[in-house]
């Protein structure tokens, strides 16, 4: 009996040694696989360095190589492979390296989409053809869209193109103190962007409100709103309402067939509050401006 137990113990010991020996190559294989996967990843650096067109804001230095912090407060970058989003990064001006985004990716061909804007939240890049913004509210917006082939470490300097057209209302008369808000309701443009075509992706009904400042009550007012035209040139129908604190309309004007163009300011300038009644006939001037280009129209 003792001899049998001794033989059994010896057999178990030999089995354990064999199992241990068999497992070692498996562990080595896993380690080699991990090392191989790491070696197959490449470091890519994207720097938002230039803007093809200068900003609408004339207070900013007019240069085609404007610092991103002077133009926008948010950047979103997404990479797609075979139509599937594989990377999605958002930055704002609180980030120490705002304007510089680093990623690691395996070899392959990718569609890169970058959006720079100053909205209340990050842009949603659902696909290169569908980019939207929080509450469909728009600001001056720039984009980059390019296919890249990854086969090694690389750096990319992104030259951003302006994506929007601007409508600017200039009132030459003082705004009544009862007016607290200027409301813009407009159709004909889009609040969703297609980075592959560089134009609007959907037919949108856009509403923007601008608070009237004390300075504007004392003199002329200027109000800017944006849209993505469906073609490089498009037309809008815009209704502008002056509202009191309760949201009641004090006076209102509708502008038909307003021409808009990407990277262009369409400016309507005139006396908006003549008699502060909607029945008054006002004449507005019209103009337009590049880099921003501007065209002005009288109303």
Task: Set out the residue ranges of the language-model regions.
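Structural motif
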Residues: 47-70, 170-178
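Beta-strand secondary-structure signal
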Residues: 41-45, 76, 111-113, 155-157, ...
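Extracellular beta-sheet/turn segments enriched in Thr/Pro/Gly and aliphatic residues
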Residues: 132-163, 168-172, 253-299
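Short loop/turn and low-complexity linker motifs enriched in small/turn-promoting residues
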Residues: 162-166, 173-177, 186-191
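Bacterial N-terminal signal peptides that target proteins for export
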Residues: 1-9
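Bacterial Sec-dependent N-terminal signal peptides
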Residues: 11, 16-55, 263, 282-299
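Tryptophan-paired
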Residues: 66-126, 180-262, 293-299
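Short coil/turn motif common to extracellular beta-sandwich-like domains
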Residues: 36-46, 56-61, 161-165, 233
């Amino acid at each position: 009996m003792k001899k049998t137990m001794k033989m059994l113990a010896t057999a178990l010991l030999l089995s354990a040694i064999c199992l241990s020996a068999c497992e070692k190559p498996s562990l080595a294989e896993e380690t080699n696989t991990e090392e191989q996967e790491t070696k197959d990843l490449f470091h890519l650096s994207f720097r938002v360095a230039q803007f093809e067109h200068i900003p609408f804001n004339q207070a900013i230095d007019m240069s085609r190589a404007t610092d991103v912090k002077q133009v926008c407060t948010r950047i979103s970058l997404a990479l797609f492979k075979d139509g599937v989003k594989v990377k999605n990064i958002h930055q704002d001006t609180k980030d120490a390296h705002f304007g510089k985004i680093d990623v690691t990716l395996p070899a392959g061909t990718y569609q890169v989409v970058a959006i720079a804007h100053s909205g209340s939240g990050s842009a949603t890049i659902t696909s290169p053809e569908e980019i939207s913004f929080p509450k469909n509210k728009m600001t001056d917006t720039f984009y980059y869209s390019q296919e890249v082939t990854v086969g090694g470490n690389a750096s990319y300097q992104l030259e951003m193109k302006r994506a929007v057209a601007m409508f600017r209302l200039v009132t030459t008369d003082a705004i009544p103190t009862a007016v607290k808000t200027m409301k813009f309701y407009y159709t004909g443009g889009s609040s969703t962007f297609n980075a592959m075509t560089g134009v609007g992706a959907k037919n949108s009904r856009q509403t923007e409100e601008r608070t009237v400042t004390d300075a504007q009550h004392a003199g002329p007012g200027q109000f800017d709103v944006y849209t993505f035209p469906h073609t490089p040139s498009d037309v809008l129908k815009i209704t502008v309402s002056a509202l009191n604190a309760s949201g009641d309309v004090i006076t209102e004007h509708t502008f038909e067939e307003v021409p808009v163009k990407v990277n262009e300011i369409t400016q309507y300038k005139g006396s908006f509050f003549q008699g502060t009644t909607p029945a008054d006939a006002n004449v507005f001037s019209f103009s337009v401006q590049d880099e921003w280009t501007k065209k002005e129209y009288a109303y």
